[in-house]
Amino acid sequence: LYQIDSSFTDSIVFKKKPNYVTNTLDTTKFTFTNLRKGKYLMIALKESSSDYLFNPKVDKIGFYPDTIMLPRDSVINTPIQVFKEIQPYRFRRAKETNKGKIIFGYDGKVKDFRVKITSDVPTDFKSISKFEIDKDTLNYWFTPVESDSLNFLVYNDVFLDTVTVRLRKKKIDSLILKSSINGTLHFRDTFFINSNNPIVKVDTSKISIINKDTIAISFKELSIDTKNKVALLFDKKPEQKYSLKIFPGAFSDIYEQKNDTLTFNLSTKEIEDYGRITMNIVNETNENLIIDLISGKNKDEIIERNFISGTSKNLVFDLLKPKSYFVRAIIDTNKNGKWDTGNYLQKTLPETIIFYETELELRANYYLDGNVFTIKK
């Protein structure tokens, strides 16, 4: 608790320890005692070091949005959600990792982040840029040039940096292809070929899929522009086996490297090996909702995501593997299709996340119907 007096400013949480401190230990409840009458700001900190000062780079913060008046506001029932702020943008560095590959690292929020080469390069020069998932990094692949350095402009919204990258590496990354699935191919799965280098050409005549009766299966190829992966889409049948063969030259990367022969054996299960969950979403917020069916020990595996625009809707999650599931709702206040964190100085709270109160334990060949999830503000 910070007492609000004539010397109080919002930035006090960065510079000065609170007037009163307590902790939650292993519960979500907390108590302050022997408080003086007056106005207060209440914050919650999850710190990397116990200095009772807010360090936005490493700490999480939460705050009560209203001024607390003592002794009037002696009981606070509104939960305080702690969150990690998005840091201001800062370009870190550019570094050559292999011949023909540079990584551009940055911190914080990016908007239209991109790089532009300003060095003179051959007319047949090619480059591909892709963001690395869950890392503040842009990967930049390019056809090698006879030069000891390259110059770039690095753009982010209104920011501009000039960068020179020294080129010393002698070896290009060999093309490595891996499958996203080995063994069981579930009906919700998409079969991907993942590559360490950007794929620039796919020759589907050098790819074959046959079932257990040696009948050729038709498929479609779909390149995922934002990732180094190619989807092979085909109609999966129950209790079936598939042999997928990729012959030499089916995939070509930016360096004109081609693959060797690859074979993948896949099998499907019976429909009865899966289950279904239905969930009636009752939206009483009149806001847009993001509804996630999730799983995993840390509830971090999104199985399916649905978007609901201000109305109620009945959702059916079918062909699910037998295991535990959870359903969560994100109140998408700014309608941008994703969860947004908060900001202490701007006094914006993170978008609300609400979990369906019951863990959904699904068995094979079983329908979990009749679930009602009412979303209130």
Q: Where in the sequence are the language-model features?
A:
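N-terminal targeting or signal-anchor segments and their processing/structural boundaries
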Residues: 1-377
